[in-house]
Amino acid sequence: MARQYPLEKFRNFGIMAHIDAGKTTTTERILFYTGRNHKIGETHDGASTMDWMAQEQERGITITSAATTCFWKGYELNIIDTPGHVDFTVEVERSLRVLDGAVTVLDAKSGVEPQTETVWRQADKYGVPRMIYVNKMDATGADYYNCINTVRERLQANAVAIQIPIGQEDQFQGMVDLLTNQAIIFKDDLGKDIEVGEVPADLADKAEEYRAAMIEAIAETDEELMMKYLEGEELTLEELKVALRKATINNEIIPVICGSSYKNKGVQQMIDGVVDYLPSPLDIPAVKGTNLDGEEEVREASDDAPMSALAFKIATDPFVGRLAFTRVYSGVLESGSYVLNSTKGKKERIGRLVKMHANSREEVESLEAAELGAVIGLKNTTTGDTLCTEAAPIILEKMEFPEPVISIAIEPKTKAGQEKMGIALSKLAEEDPTFKTWTDQETGQTIIAGMGELHLDIIVDRLQREFKVECNVGAPQVAYKETIKKAVEAEAKFARQSGGRGQYGHCKIEMIPTEGEYEFENAIVGGAIPREYIPAVDNGIREAAESGIIAGYPVINFKIRLFDGSYHDVDSSEMAFKIAGSMAFKNAMAKADAVLLEPIMKVEITVPEEYMGDVIGDVNSRRGRMEGMDSRNGAQIIRAFIPLSEMFGYATALRSRTQGRGTYAMEFDHYDDVPKSIQEEVAGKKNK
């Protein structure tokens, strides 16, 4: 089938924002204006098309990123909706991996918020070109210019206004387009009746000032334009737009525009901005991967290249079962064909291919290079896996996901629910790589772990709603870790003689504290331990490290150097060396000044001035470490690092301290040593 839209007419982009900045409403409006939605869905009523899981509709937040295709002025737009709540940053990370550009939505009265920073850092990591849309210009306290300043200060980004608002708060009527130097005024509620005219007289000076700053910023990114600009020549609209597009794609400029999605003002201009300034698949570097020989290989975005695609999300649909959201990077993915899942080394049959529109589906015969869609019928594919042709295997860059920081015990209310719960949990773990589930060896309880309390609340909610499993839930537990403070040497000998063949393994190790992942170095010389037994020592140590000596938590940040040992011709075996390895590890840890580590959260608390002292006192009582304070719109913002164990139930405490006016956001930051007194308390509880 011939391609309907050439590659340069594609825009794969995401919409990212802090919770409540109006991201879902903005996406809704894009779907409305691009003709895919006849009635606008409102998030307040729980009727929005992008938020299609029942929990999202109740809570009014977006949890699952859905990829939606729509069309605008001869362009195909694929919108990847990303959640703005910090517990779901993995979804954001995952969407950023497959999109080419992004629109960051800011709330006009709050500017840059904590989650905006998190998402911005993730977008920096993947080098995603972006533009900023300052939403809610009609809200009380809206301040466009303050927003631009917060972007420059807190995100260290070169934000350049290409529009300025005409009126704000309830007087917001439209905007001045600084490129064309014209006013755009909205005359009706649906944003269909637009009047373009002269810049209002009272705004002329401000428009002139911001237009001059914009032209200078654009000229600075292009030598030819800079020369013309310095010689005092007028730069044409076309020259400015071409240079601005290039500068945005190169991450040199972040264009800033404004609007009110809820009031239908400025959304069409934002879609025009996506087309004008965000990259097509041809504007970004070709995707890299490794072939089976471990050599780097590049795949160009072209239908003629060998097929390669990345499954970036697995979801369970009540009607068709398992959907694998996929982006095709090169070649053509055809329904009914066989492909190789190169990450797992398994063949897969492509059942049906569908393009998603929020919650409805359109079946297609094929997905071409740069297209996004969902594959039905894949058995072994999970998030982050590569699909490719067998003739030209490639593994695209693997996605990395953070480890969970909080866990709870969960049990079904009825015996019959046990098996149902097991199946449901494994399905949910397949969809979400930051959600883990296992059985506690000591208590036999089922444990679920995730990125925060809301994350686990939603998992329990889905168990009840989608899988009809009623559960009892235990109190949240912190994912402590253990580590060592000094390098030590230790040895262990495992020798057993009980009639017939004995067991013999003996090893000497050095255990060294590090900052990174576990490392095992084989420093045996002269065959003190035969080569075939070395992996057994490593495995013994890995297993022993799952349960440290303080309170049985996993041990991290250490390196093992195996430097000596001995063996017996007859009695030595892999099992004996595995046991010797785990004994040596325990002996080493006992001498190495072991400490308990706890997850420390980066917390940002927003409170009215009068509650400041009270809230800071409370932060200190929670072992918090103050990082700084700002004021924004008459509210104080307190930034601190607080141990996760002290944050349970904080929402309620903050509400009662501030009469419901305080809010907070937190995200995992790092692990740190637990004070001695608390270490003893944790160990005492665990070892009871």
Swiss-Prot record:
Residues bound to GTP: 17-24, 81-85, 135-138
Gene3D superfamilies: 3.30.230.10, 3.30.70.240, Elongation Factor G (Translational Gtpase), domain 3, P-loop containing nucleotide triphosphate hydrolases, Translation factors
UniProt cross-references to InterPro entries, sorted A to Z: EF-G-like_DII, EFG_II, EFG_III, EFG_III/V, EFG_IV, EFG_V, EFG_V-like, G_TR_CS
Location(s), subcellular: Cytoplasm
Domain tr-type G: 8-282
CDD domains per the UniProt record, alphabetical: EF-G (cd01886), EFG_III (cd16262), EFG_mtEFG1_IV (cd01434), EFG_mtEFG_C (cd03713), EFG_mtEFG_II (cd04088)
Alphabetical list of SUPFAM superfamilies matching this protein: EF-G C-terminal domain-like, P-loop containing nucleoside triphosphate hydrolases, Ribosomal protein S5 domain 2-like, Translation proteins
Any single biological process term in GO: ribosome disassembly
Principal subcellular localization: cytoplasm
Pfam name, any one: GTP_EFTU
MF terms in GO: GTP binding; GTPase activity; translation elongation factor activity
CC terms in the record's Gene Ontology section: cytoplasm
Source superkingdom: Bacteria
Transmembrane segments: none
Keywords of the record: Cytoplasm, Elongation factor, GTP-binding, Nucleotide-binding, Protein biosynthesis
Family that this chain belongs to: Belongs to the TRAFAC class translation factor GTPase superfamily. Classic translation factor GTPase family. EF-G/EF-2 subfamily.
Entry function: Catalyzes the GTP-dependent ribosomal translocation step during translation elongation. During this step, the ribosome changes from the pre-translocational (PRE) to the post-translocational (POST) state as the newly formed A-site-bound peptidyl-tRNA and P-site-bound deacylated tRNA move to the P and E sites, respectively. Catalyzes the coordinated movement of the two tRNA molecules, the mRNA and conformational changes in the ribosome.
Name assigned to this protein: Elongation factor G
